[in-house]
Amino acid sequence: MAEMEKEGRPPENKRSRKPAHPVKREINEEMKNFAENTMNELLGWYGYDKVELKDGEDIEFRSYPTDGESRQHISVLKENSLPKPKLPEDSVISPYNISTGYSGLATGNGLSDSPAGSKDHGNVPIIVPLIPPPFIKPPAEDDVSNVQIMCAWCQKVGIKRYSLSMGSEVKSFCSEKCFAACRRAYFKRNKARDEDGHAENFPQQHYAKETPRLAFKNNCELLVCDWCKHIRHTKEYLDFGDGERRLQFCSAKCLNQYKMDIFYKETQANLPAGLCSTLHPPMENKTEGTGVQLLTPDSWNIPLTDARRKAPSPVAAAGQSQGPGPSASTTVSPSDTANCSVTKIPTPVPKSMPISETPNIPPVSVQPPASIGPPLGVPPRSPPMVMTNRGPVPLPIFMEQQIMQQLRPPFIRGPPHHASNPNSPLSNPMLPGIGPPPGGPRNLGPTSSPMHRPLLSPHIHPPSTPTMPGNPPGLLPPPPPGAPLPSLPFPPVSMMPNGPMPVPQMMNFGLPSLAPLVPPPTLLVPYPVIVPLPVPIPIPIPVPHVSDSKPPNGFSSNGENFIPSAPGDSSAAGGKPGGHSLSPRDSKQGSSKSADSPPGCSGQALSLAPAPAEHGRSEVVDLTRRAGSPPGAGGQLGFPGGVLQGPQDGVIDLTVGHRARLHNVIHRALHAHVKAEREPGAAERRTCGGCRDGHCSPPAAGDPGPGAPAGPEAAAACNVIVNGTRGAAEGAKGAEPPPEQPPPPPPPPPAPPKKLLSPEEPAVSELESVKENNCASNCHLDGEAAKKLMGEEALAGGDKSDPNLNNPADEDHAYALRMLPKTGCVIQPVPKPAEKAAMAPCIISSPMLSAGPEDLEPPLKRRCLRIRNQNK
């Protein structure tokens, strides 16, 4: 064992030679690599670059003088630089030494008594740390002896295994663990002192003595990044600012983060005091209150030196009085501050923001406070502070939530605010963000009313919403937080308080329920946030119909829709789909004409517009009343004058003006058995013509008088046309006479209808093609129309006795697809080429048909095709 001990400790005269035993050399090589890697890893933990042993040796020779004291400190520097390498190297030998009872060697570590070594061996200590372990000088015998020391770190008595020269004193340690802990503590202390700007108080030499490693790094021109606190070489640094504010960042990423942080803070500082008074003071005060600067974005808004001296944040300095509350937490430790900064998110205080300030506030910034009440979970002493409903939320996520909340409050609280503060010039709901913050008028203090709390606390929200004082009488109370958007369904127009822009008002109904899900907004985000507004703009489809059907009492007896059953109304309704709504004047004319017509003819076709108008517009409604049905048989409500008896069984409603209704007039023939040969009177033919060529209805409309007697025949003819095939041909016949006759004129000459008899066959084929087109255009009709037809069909059920009759309700809903499936056929609006010349008004139908396909929907089209096939 003695030999091994000697081998492990080469004599001093052999220090310059490599170890005699190759095994020893291998171990030393391995340990050297291990030491270098371990030290580099340790340095990496503290943000230092890795150090090459040879490079370090050269640097040391260049950087320090060679006097005894400097060498002594150089030795310490090396010890600090590579504490582990020496330990493992000697620990390899230590087993032998310890086994022989020579424990002193293990404790020496070759550097433990570096001061003595430097005295005894001249320049040797300078190179000892950086040369391979074999060259490490073993401690002198007196040094190697079991020296009992009190560990400088754990304060326990033990064998001295490490010593660290701290300039004027030498600290001894009983174990590697204590040595590393002490070194780490000094490193942190010196780094913090340097960051605090106290470096000027400590000369460089002092650092060299106290923490040689730090001096070594400074000499190498390695600086600490002002953002990430990592050490990079100066050539990689980016300078930002000048003078005292000059900062250095290790990468563009750090610089950008710093700029973004400053941008956030400046933006918030410019907001009114009430909005962001507490946004940053808490964070900055916390971070600054701790001895060590907390690495949070908020701490870098200002120069490092100023940030450490300044307690109030720039926002607080702007005149915000909220700072004191947050400052109470300034003494928390760095870890605490990290948590607090997230958990205690300051919220704007509505009471501190007078309405007068709002005009200058960007819309987004103003609204967040509006919906934010004093945080519920915050102690009373610091009302401005708020914890999110979900507990501590990471700052980035919280910011996004804030943005969402900021956009929502205008809609949630906007109406209440407007109701309570109608005189506010900015109360226009169109710009929710511009209006005075709802919170402003309420001036709610820390003891926020339920109005504010509902947004913050789902627990309080449901009970408080019904009694929200600010809600306008028309507004529905916000649904409980659980309900997604129960109140969003289109509110009546009357419920929208501020007429100019009802949409935001509508938003108010549903959005309050969302508020509890999102923490109150407290941050102003400098970038635009596109927030989809869930505004279901409820444009009731019947609205256009309502406007057209406004003629008196012109609602179908079905009552399902607003489409009037009166001829004028039906024409108007038909016009709506087609886009050619009759003017009230026309509808009135139609009603008056119908009134003038004999009672028997009241159900018959009425032309609402004058003949010229009819030709110009295909707005004429042709109603052919079944002759068999009494004038009063109509189940529908006529105009006040009783003009229409729409419900009559035989009435066929053709709205020439609207492609949807005229072209799409699909009448359900109760019985497909219609005799095409039947051509009773000219009036009947005209009626047929009107039905077939819905565009030619004007003449039919003009038939009221004659049509009464011929009503039955006309109905049959029309039914024939509706049924298709031969009936259609006859319809074409009848259609010719009407073309140019004004609606008022009496029955057109029967001869032209006869002429049309010849084209009966082509008319049928044409009818087939037209049916398809008509179906397409009819597909355009709304589900409402179908419903109407169904209702009308039910009404007409009593009159179904006549096989040729179409549903009386079909007047208004000639195009109702549901009714067709039985035997009904689409009346072809497009006349044959031969007929077109005679039927100028009929020509109008073609453009309407062309327009029809735009609106048609595939399902409806399929249905129309099905109906056509059945009719065939």
Curated annotation (Swiss-Prot):
List, as start-end ranges, the regions of compositional bias called Pro residues. 460-484, 736-753
Glycyl lysine isopeptide (Lys-Gly) (interchain with G-Cter in SUMO2), cross-linked positions: 675
Region named Disordered: 1-26, 308-354, 411-484, 550-619, 728-770
Return the GO cellular component terms, semicolon-separated.
nucleus
Zinc finger spans (FCS-type)? 142-180, 216-256
Bias class Low complexity marks the residues at 417-433
Compositionally biased residues, Polar residues: 319-344
Q: Which GO terms describe its molecular function?
A: zinc ion binding
The family line of this record is: Belongs to the SOBP family.
The record describes the protein's role as: Implicated in development of the cochlea.
Protein name per UniProt: Sine oculis-binding protein homolog
